[in-house]
Each structure stands twice: as C-alpha cells, then as structure tokens.
C-alpha cells in the first residue's frame, strides 16, 4: 500500500527508492527530552540533528537489544545515555521512540513494540506487560480513594459498566485496541480496571473503550470519529501509517534541522505538535457550514480552535482576507494571540486577526463615526446611572416591582432578546425570571425601559447589546448595498473562530453571523454551557441564523484537570440544568480525566479571617513540598493561584500573603501572565476564565451551596475556578 493522503500526495521528501529516509519522533521521546539535565539535553539535540540528516549513516551504531519487537535498536548518545529507535525491516521510516540512562532505556524497550493496527492503519507503541490477567495489571496511580459512584462518569468499581467480552476483534481493533491486547481488554469488567490499562493503551482506544463502557455503541463511537475501517491495511507500511490522524496524535515527522531543534528546545509545548485524533480531524478539512464543538473544562477546545485557525489561514483564506479569532475577554485574546504566534509562521499570522468581540465592535463602530459611547456597565458609568435613575422615577409604583427586578428584566429579557418595542416585549420569552407578568403588566413595565433608552440617547450613550445590534445592522446594510451594486463585498473575513461561545449572547451571535458570508468554513464555535458565568448570555444558535445541524461535535477527554479535581468540581453542578448552546441539554457524564492526583476536602469556615488562614496554610504546604523536591535535584516550577469572588476579598488575602513574605501578582484586564512562577497569582473568579495554573485555591461563600435554582450561577463560577487547576485544588467557603 502506498503512503498517500486522500489527494494522493506522499510525505514530503519521500517516496521513490533512494529518497531521503523519513525520521519521526514520538510523544514519549519529546516528553523524555523535557526531563533531561541541560548538559544531556544538548548532547541529545546534537545526536538527533545528525540522525535526522541521515539515519543510515555509518557513524550511527545500531545495537541489538532484548525486546519483544525485533526492530527496536539502541543508539549510543554518550557513555551512559541511549536512544531507542525503531529501525524498519523494510521501508524508510526511522522512529525515535525514547531516551534515557542505559539500563532504564533498555528496560523501557524490553516489553514494547511499534506496530500498525490492521483495521485503523495507525502506528501504535504497544506495551506488552508480562501479566496474565487484568487483576495483575498495575493500578491507577491515585493518591486518594475515588467515590464509588460519581455524577460525571468517573466513578469507582460499582459504576454501571458495559462488558467488552462480546465485542468482535474487528470492533475492538476499530476502536484502536492493539491486537496484542485484545484478550486483556475483553477481561475488563469495571472502569477502574480500564484505568489500570490506561498506560498500555493508545489514547483513541482508551477513549473508545470508556465511551462503550459508559453505554455508547461501537458504531456511535466510530461514527463520531468519522473513521473508515473498511480499507485494506499494509501493516508494514509505516510511511502510510504516519498519515493517519491517530498516528499524528503521537508521532511527528521531522522535515529539517530547524523543525527538530524547535521541537526539542520546547518539548513541553506539545500542544503545538500533537492533537488527539478527534481534534486533528476537526482542525483540518473543509466544512460545509458552521461547526459547534462542545467540551468540558480542560478538553482542549481552545487548542483545537487555534489549530483550526492555522489550517484555515493556510488552506482556505484568499489574499486580502483574514481569519478572525475572537473570544470574550481582552486577557484571553492576548493569551491566544501569543500562543498562535508560537504555533504559526509570521506569514500565516498575517492572515489571522485576534480580538475580543467588545474591542472589535468598538473599532468597527468608531471607523464608521458612530455617535454613541458604549456603556459596558450601567452601575459604574455615571451617565448610564443618571439615565437609569430618571427611568426608575417614572415607573408605576402600583406594580410593586423592585428596582432589582427592572435591572434583571432589562438585562435578561430586553437586551438579551434584542427587544425594541412594546409589542416585541409582549411576545418575549421570560423563562426562569421567577415573576409572572400578564400582558397588562408588561405594558406598564415597558415605558420604563423605553425611557431609559431615550435618556441614554440624549447623552449619546448605548448599552453594549444595543451597540452590537447597530453593528449587525451596519454589516448587513453594507453587504446588501455591495451586492445590489455588483461591487465586491466589504466583508474581509473568510472565517470566524469563536472561543468561549457559552458567554456570547443573542446579539453577539447575530453579529458574528453577519461578519462572514454563508459559505464553507464560515463559522467555528467552541464552548461549554457548564462554564457560562454570565447568565444573561444564554442563547440558541439556531435562533441567531446559525445552522449547526450535522456539524456538532464533542470532546470527551480532559487533558488538564485530574480526576480528583474534576470530581469535586462536577459535584457542585449535580442537578444543575445545562444547555448545549442551541436550546438542547448537555451533560458531563461521558467526560474523562486522563490524570490522577491529590484530593483535598472542601473546607467550610466561619469568616474571612479563617478563610485567609486556610489559604496561607495551603500555600505554605505547597511551597515546602516544592522546596523538598528541589533539594533532591528535582527542579520544579509550579504556579499557584488564589481565585476569589470579589476584589475586596482578593486584596485582603493578598496583603496577608505579602506579610508572610510571599511574592504576589494580581491578574486584571491589563496584567499579562508574565510574573515569575513562584509569585502567587490573584484573580477574581470571572477574571480567571480561560486561564490555567498548576495549583488553585478557590475562596467562595458558603451560600453557594444553597438551593440549586438560586445558586446555579455561583456553582458554575466555582466549577470554572476549580477546573483552572492542573495538579491540585482546594475549595474554601466562609
């Protein structure tokens, strides 16, 4: 079988006999490189560069080793360090698999083999443990006991689980299970036993088995992957295998010295190189219309969106056009732009514009001499406060409605739905508002909102949602005029990528629809309703002119947050209704964390002073643990963040930490994430959105654990904050 893509193209620089051999590096090889001492790292880089130039050179001494794979070889780096390489029996693909001390490298290679799955065609490093039953398999490395049954799908031995015993070889292979592991997989009886095999299984197999165990059919899993498993596979053609998305999730082809040096010098930034097969397929290829990708916290939605922007800029964007990448806050936009610059070439970045939507609207309207100043918070804006006070003075006192009611009604009904007249207000949906308003009462309430808008207009002010509506109208008018006159459209974007979609309301989605024509690859959304921290922004795409039917996907694997942190966060949302961004329902049952770590029980204290004491205790314990590791030459550099509900609480805790001799930094809209790793980060729960840290302490109010309907929003905030953590998280309530 020839190594071809769907279009018939071969891997660059390979093909006919005599062409330069193909050199690939595995995920494990790069991960090991990241751990090497500096002096050894330099030697590995020099050796790997020479290997990339010509892996068949006489100076490279391949040594036979004891391994279950007869094609694995050891290559000397210096007296003590060895590289493990797959040297093909036929073909021209040489694969760097591992690097370590002599004995450790040999031990790693002993029970491993590089094989091609005969159904999927993917390259897989298979771990052939010398065990005869699942019971002897190594257990999951967990420091605490996992609950027996837990909402969210990551439970213990008693969690309902489907058996794999009746699945055919073809089905298991199609899910990604290596042929050598079929018998062991069939004996798995619980989710915990599947976790015990996690290190032995390719990622796509682990995910597929988890979904089948949780209740999905094999056909459902394969259908969601859009994977063909009906083609003949040559299990010796590694060149063809490298073209499979499953292979590219763990192997990368090295094309030149510069590429190899870049990867080896920044091995921790593996998100730039490896994508899960599902992410890879979503990031590449043409789509016939808008795409929506859902995924819980830590599932790689933003990484996927960045890779999608790169692919579109390089493959589907004409000269003179751009891909717009937009998100909710300025901090996130700056962080994404920095990451895109490390992912994309300067030429590709010329075709990508990154801007949060508020900033985009401001620039767009200003360029068209918009006569109004946009109000982003009426309670903080002097002009808006005066306009609101005037409107409140005109309300009908006989209705017995509070000012808070009017404030929330205007936000959650009038602005959210773009209501601009009494008749539209009569027909507006008011689900979840808690107060029933008959038609006569709506007629009596409406003049207050009408008066407020008139008062704003006299002051040349506009609420942000109304400004968005004006921007949408201008875009639609400009497009219609260009079409009527036969001129080229003034729309400069070929595609729009939207991150944190759950926090964009109806007017935002309608604006995004108007930014780009209805063509292939027009809109790409990633989001998660569980992380909506602005309740007024719940919207349905289908009611904003965005049709995602047949183009909706989901990411299930959590790469960031440990199972223990995720379980604690998910428990807060048990019973909370969550939408799928299009008036449907979403759930967390099938999400799965790939890592385990320490678990800390929720702490409830009486007051802020006690909460501060507990926060300082956490930080000191973490600092002492890191110091102990560093004393043993295990250099660690782990970030810690304290996330709180208000700036007042933030200031109080920060001052105490400073008095304890800790360096601190406050993350706000103007503060970039550039502080030294040892500095404790401080942020409000809202400001922490989209960020990640090694360790997190969340300080909230005990009232967040009250009635579900009344506390749903506070629970979402705590969920978002806890899932910013990669290794450890503590929740303190006062």
Question: PLM features: what roles do these ranges have?
Answer:
Residues 176, 188-192, 200-204, 209-216, ...:
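A basic/glycine-biased coupling hinge at the interface between accessory DNA-binding modules
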Residues 25, 36, 201, 274-275, ...:
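Alpha-helical hairpin
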Residues 238-277, 294, 401-494:
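Accessory N-terminal region flanking or inserted into the helicase ATPase core
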Residues 32-35, 269-274, 394-398:
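Short amphipathic alpha-helical boundary/capping segments
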Residues 1-82, 87-243, 429-432:
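Basic, Lys/Arg-enriched alpha-helical interface segments
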Residues 272, 276-322, 328-376, 438-441, ...:
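Conserved helicase motor core of SF1/SF2 NTP-dependent helicases
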């Amino acid at each position: 079988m020839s190594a071809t893509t769907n279009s018939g193209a071969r891997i660059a620089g390979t093909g006919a006999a005599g062409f330069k051999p193909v050199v690939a590096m595995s995920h494990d090889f790069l991960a090991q490189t990241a751990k090497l001492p500096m002096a050894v790292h330099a030697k590995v880089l020099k050796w790997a560069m020479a290997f990339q130039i010509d892996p068949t050179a006489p100076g490279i001494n391949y040594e036979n080793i004891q391994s279950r794979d007869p094609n694995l070889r050891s290559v000397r780096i210096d007296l003590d360090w060895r590289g493990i390489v797959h040297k093909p029996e036929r073909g021209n693909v040489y694969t760097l698999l591992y690097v370590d001390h002599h004995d450790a490298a040999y031990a790693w290679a002993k029970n491993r083999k590089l094989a091609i799955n005969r159904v999927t065609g993917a390259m897989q490093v298979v771990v052939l443990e010398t065990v005869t039953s699942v019971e002897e398999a190594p257990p999951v490395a967990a420091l605490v006991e996992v609950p027996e049954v837990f909402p969210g799908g990551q439970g213990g031995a008693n969690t309902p689980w489907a058996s794999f015993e009746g699945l055919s070889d073809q089905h298991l292979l199609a899910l990604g299970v290596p042929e050598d592991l079929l018998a062991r997989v069939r004996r798995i009886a619980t989710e915990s036993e599947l976790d015990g095999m996690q290190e032995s299984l390719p990622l796509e197999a682990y995910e597929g088995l988890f979904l089948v165990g949780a209740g999905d059919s094999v056909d459902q899993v394969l259908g969601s992957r859009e994977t063909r498993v009906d083609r003949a596979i040559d299990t010796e053609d590694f060149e063809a295998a490298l073209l499979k998305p499953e292979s590219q999730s763990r192997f990368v082809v090295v094309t030149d010295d510069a590429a190899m040096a870049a990867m080896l010098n920044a091995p921790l930034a593996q998100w730039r190189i490896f994508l899960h097969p599902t992410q890879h397929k979503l990031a590449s290829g043409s789509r016939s219309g808008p795409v929506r990708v859902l995924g819980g916290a830590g599932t790689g939605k933003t990484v996927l969106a960045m890779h999608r922007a790169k692919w579109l800029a390089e493959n589907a964007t004409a000269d003179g056009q751009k891909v717009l990448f937009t998100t909710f806050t300025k901090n996130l936009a700056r962080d994404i732009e920095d990451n895109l610059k490390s992912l994309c070439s300067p030429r590709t970045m010329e075709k990508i514009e990154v801007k949060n939507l508020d900033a985009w609207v401001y620039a767009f309207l200003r360029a068209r001499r918009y006569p109004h100043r946009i109000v982003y918070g009426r309670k903080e804006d002097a002009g808006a406060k005066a306009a609101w006070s005037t409107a409140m003075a005109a309300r009908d006192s006989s209705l017995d409605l509070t000012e808070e009611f009017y404030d929330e009604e205007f936000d959650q009904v009038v602005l959210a739905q773009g209501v601009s007249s009494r008749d539209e207000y009569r027909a507006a949906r008011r689900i979840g508002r808690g107060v029933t308003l008959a038609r006569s009462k709506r007629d009596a309430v409406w003049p207050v909102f009408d008066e407020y808008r008139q008062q704003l207009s006299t002051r040349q002010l506009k609420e942000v949602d109304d400004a968005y509506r004006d921007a949408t109208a201008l875009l639609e008018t400009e497009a219609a005029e260009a079409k009527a006159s036969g001129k080229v459209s003034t729309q400069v974007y070929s595609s729009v990528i939207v991150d944190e979609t759950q926090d964009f309301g109806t007017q935002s989605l309608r604006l995004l629809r108007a930014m780009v024509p209805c063509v292939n690859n027009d809109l790409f959304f990633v989001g998660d309703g569980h992380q909506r921290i602005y309740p007024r922004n719940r919207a349905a795409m289908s009611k904003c002119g965005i049709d995602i039917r047949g183009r909706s996907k989901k990411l299930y694997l959590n790469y960031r947050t440990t199972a223990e942190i995720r379980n604690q966060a998910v428990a807060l949302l048990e019973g909370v209704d969550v939408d799928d961004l299009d008036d449907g329902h979403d759930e967390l049952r099938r999400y799965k964390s790939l890592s385990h770590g320490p678990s800390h029980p929720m702490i409830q204290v009486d007051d802020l002073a006690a909460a501060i004491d507990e926060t300082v205790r956490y930080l000191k314990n973490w600092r002492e643990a890191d110091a102990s590791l560093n004393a043993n030459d295990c250099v660690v550099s782990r970030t810690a963040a304290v996330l709180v509900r208000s700036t007042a609480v933030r200031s109080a805790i920060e001052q105490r930490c400073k008095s304890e001799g800790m360096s601190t930094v406050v993350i706000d809209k103007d503060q970039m994430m550039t502080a030294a790793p040892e500095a404790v980060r401080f942020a409000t729960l809202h400001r922490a959105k989209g960020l990640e840290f090694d360790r997190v302490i969340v300080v909230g109010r005990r009232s967040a654990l009250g009635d579900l309907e009344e506390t749903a929003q506070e629970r979402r905030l705590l969920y978002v904050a806890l899932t910013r953590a990669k290794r450890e998280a503590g929740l303190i309530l006062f």
